[in-house]
UniProtKB/Swiss-Prot annotation:
Protein name: 2-hydroxyisoflavanone synthase
SUPFAM superfamilies, per the entry: Cytochrome P450
Enzyme class: oxidoreductase
One CC-aspect GO term: endoplasmic reticulum
Cofactor(s) listed: heme
Species of the source: Glycyrrhiza uralensis (Chinese licorice)
Membrane-spanning parts: 2-22
Coiled-coil annotated residue ranges, if any: none
Binding site for heme: C450
Amino acid sequence: MLVELAITLLVIALFIHLRPTPSAKSKSLRHLPNPPSPKPRLPFVGHLHLLDKPLLHNSLIDLSKRYGPLYSLYFGSMPTVVVSTPELFKLFLQTHEASSFNTRFQTPAIRRLTYDNSVAMVPFGPYWKFIRKLIMNDLLNATTVNKLRPLRSQEIRKVLRVMALSAESQVPLNVTEELLKWTNSTISRMMLGEAEEIRDIARDVLKIFGEYSLTDFIWPLKKLKVGQYEKRIDDIFNRFDPVIERVIKKRQEIRKKRKERNGEVEEGEQSVVFLDTLLDFAEDETMEIKITKEQIKGLVVDFFSAGTDSTAVATEWALSELINNPRVLQKAREEVDAVVGKDRLVDEADVQNLPYIRSIVKETFRMHPPLPVVKRKCVQECEIDGYAIPEGALILFNVWAVGRDPKYWDRPTEFRPERFLENVGEGDQAVDLRGQHFQLLPFGSGRRMCPGVNLATAGMATLLASVIQCFDLSVVGPQGKILKGNDAKVSMEESAGLTVPRAHNLVCVPVARSSAVPKLFSS
């Protein structure tokens, strides 16, 4: 039996190895070469052995130094193209997006855990257009977002109160965990109408979204289910699905009772809930596309996976940079004190008048993008920069590399928010996060850009400004002691994952600014 299996695998490996590299199907592209590629391409694994760094973006940077800003690899049997400059980003994500690169690459984990209905991942088409329009017009429109502003303010003040208690007791605070609680509770209340505690499950979902199995890339292994990958997917699904089922059922009961009261909202009951809007559409027989329960579940997972971990991780990176760069922290504090004053707490509406705080957010996303490697799938072959890009190829955009490339950023390894405020009238000050400046794409670009970019950046800026206004953060070392002087810095080591979090939790003892903290308990 083992001999037969070994022979079978050897034959498969030889078949994959000897199978020719796909060439362009259309006559107009047949004369074009594929992007440069390392030699040799190994049987079975292709070029996977070249990804020898713990973090994918670092391996891709090393390869780009040898093969240029546009090169091709084989992840097992899957053709893969790596893109590493803003100029090429624009060709892929703007010039040719509509025809060739409007679809994202999905793994089995993404398909299963989003019920194969993720608006972030489903192929471009009528359903995607319909759901995207629903999200932008009915869930994330200005009126709805503004109605939920008090809720977001409450969640930020919860964080500040926890920090104030830590400051009073001098007990070290795991800031990493508090930030995850903040984003989980905020998204949960906006989406579901209650603070459902699912951050551990959401974290596991994001973790496996950022992982790959050999079965994703070596097609003969798909039926074999090698390793624990599929089992982990099933385990996470079996934990997550009952929670969503329970919340939807509970929400339907609340809606039923509300109808019996002729739509009257009870005292203390949240009036604006995203899930209500989705259930309204599901019950509307006149809708052009009928929304199913599975599609609603997929959207719930979308909001949690996109809004919980990524915002918490980015905010933690920002706080870490502020701890390590006291000059930036002092300048930010002076701005907050000048604009907001010391008689009230920062409000989300203040962010528009805090340009340096907004620049800190941009600088954080430049150095620590939520998605360091953005993925698309080529759905129609095309020509890019004199090369043929084959249909079905996985496209990897190394956003992390561009954010630290000295060709596009002055002193790129320095955390310097001023770069977004300098040279008034030209240059960096015009760079925003909306996907039109291809040297800064933390939320993607084009049709597949994250729809919640404004909500995420406003929340992050408000929390940062609030913490800056109220506290200093004293770093706690491994032994639980507060670090002083040059030792009072935090590690900026990255960890593997879809959003590339810090490798170590941020643990601090907050130090209250006496003028601000009492207001936390009187508001």
